[in-house]
């Protein structure tokens, strides 16, 4: 049996509440900048949740023509923006046949803005006034399809739709596709744009969102004061490539995706398993596949949403997979304290964070972690970034429906 091929990352792209290019994003993440503020997209006077992490500096016209903008939902625009950055940096297009280049790009929800505007038009003007493009604009696979069209990716264009684990599952399944020889390179990631009235109302009414008015007291992962997550939005894109193909063309390599774990709690629609069992198994799978020796220096970019149940369950999962002692030694932070919860984009953006940690040795913080919850007794990087030599990075993603995904990253 052939040895599985190694998969590396040769391009990164981001659209986020902390910046819509890599340099701005990374500076703000490591400086501990909060990307959360009052919602500006609509009047929130009737909503309990009034803050979100909105993308502020994205210009879709930089990536799309006027005609294309009219035919794409905002979530797909974010996806194309991030993908263009990653593909441009990697230089992958033209280095391999189109049928060896694939796309794995997902969204937790899809074109919610399009759905909302379409329903409003239906109610106000009747069925004949509903756009003929509403279906292709709203479906969650269209970002993958549009990216494939843009770069002639004929290997396959698969979306992951696993709620908050979407970005991580898209990357993980892309890794498996390359490892087993079905493709030589894949554009992978996730995107979301659901800060619209329906999205906010739905999450508020299920009591998932923080209702704090102060942006600096809203997203509080692992803090005893935490009371819900803050909605974010944006996209993250990575170009994944077989190691020898990347080396042969002299590509810059950020790091290797050395492990992937994917499990399901099979427990509850929205709540994590109370003992963190599914998350524990996903972490353990990623560690085993990555060849973790037990004495390596770890950084974990936690799912860390800031909900009471999630953070406690994830703590159990981390300690369950690593053991009590090692689980308390690994450096842990949640960048959702700054970006909010980017939902389907979260795993992709947090994978980018892990790769930048390996490259720079700078570990970003969990900001506003002022009262650590004793139940979440991990080695938190609180308030300010730290310099550390890291051997192995993990990124955890836990989604509604019981989806759990962990990615592991190493230097090459």
Predicted regions and their residues:
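Condensing-enzyme catalytic core mediating Claisen C-C bond formation in acyl metabolism
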Residues: 6-10, 34-37, 214-292, 298-299
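A glycine- and small-aliphatic-rich helix-loop capping segment at beta-alpha/alpha-beta transitions
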Residues: 23-30, 113-127, 177-180, 200-213, ...
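ACP-dependent fatty acid/polyketide chain-elongation machinery
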Residues: 1-68, 244-254, 352-366, 410-412
């Amino acid at each position: 049996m052939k040895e599985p091929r190694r998969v590396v990352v040769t391009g990164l792209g981001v659209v986020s509440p902390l910046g819509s290019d890599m340099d701005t994003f990374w500076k703000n993440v490591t400086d501990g900048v909060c990307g959360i503020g009052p919602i500006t997209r609509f009047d929130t006077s009737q909503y309990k949740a009034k803050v979100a992490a909105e993308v502020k500096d994205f210009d879709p016209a930089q990536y799309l023509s006027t005609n294309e903008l009219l035919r794409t939902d905002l979530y797909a625009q974010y996806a194309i923006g991030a993908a263009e950055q990653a593909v441009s940096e990697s230089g992958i297009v033209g280095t391999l046949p189109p049928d060896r280049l694939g796309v794995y790009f997902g969204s937790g929800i899809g074109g919610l803005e399009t759905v909302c505007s379409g329903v409003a038009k239906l109610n106000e003007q009747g069925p004949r006034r509903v756009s003929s493009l509403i279906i292709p604009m709203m479906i969650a696979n269209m970002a993958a399809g549009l990216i494939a069209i843009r770069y002639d990716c004929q290997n396959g264009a698969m979306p992951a739709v696993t709620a908050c684990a979407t970005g991580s599952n898209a990357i993980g399944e892309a890794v498996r596709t390359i490892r087993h020889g079905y493709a030589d390179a894949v554009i992978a990631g996730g995107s979301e744009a659901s800060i619209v009235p329906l999205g906010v109302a739905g999450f508020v009414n299920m009591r998932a969102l923080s209702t704090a008015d102060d942006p600096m007291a809203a997203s509080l992962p692992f803090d005893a004061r935490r009371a819900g997550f803050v909605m974010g939005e944006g996209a993250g894109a990575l170009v994944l490539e077989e190691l020898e193909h990347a080396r042969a063309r002299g590509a810059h390599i950020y790091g290797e995706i050395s492990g992937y774990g994917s499990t399901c709690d099979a427990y509850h629609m929205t709540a994590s398993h109370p003992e963190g069992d599914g998350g524990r198994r996903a972490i353990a799978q990623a560690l085993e596949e990555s060849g973790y020796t037990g004495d390596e220096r770890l950084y974990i970019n936690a799912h860390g949403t800031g909900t009471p149940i999630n953070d406690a369950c994830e703590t159990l999962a981390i300690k369950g997979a690593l053991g009590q002692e090692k689980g308390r030694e690994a450096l842990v932070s949640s960048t959702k304290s700054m970006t909010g919860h980017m939902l389907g984009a979260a795993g992709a953006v947090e994978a980018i964070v892990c790769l930048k940690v390996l490259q720079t040795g700078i570990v970003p913080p969990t900001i506003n972690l002022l009262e650590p919850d004793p139940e979440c007794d991990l080695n938190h990087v609180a308030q300010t970034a730290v310099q550390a030599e890291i051997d192995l990075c993990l990124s955890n993603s836990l989604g509604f429906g019981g989806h759990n995904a962990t990615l592991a990253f190493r230097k090459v």
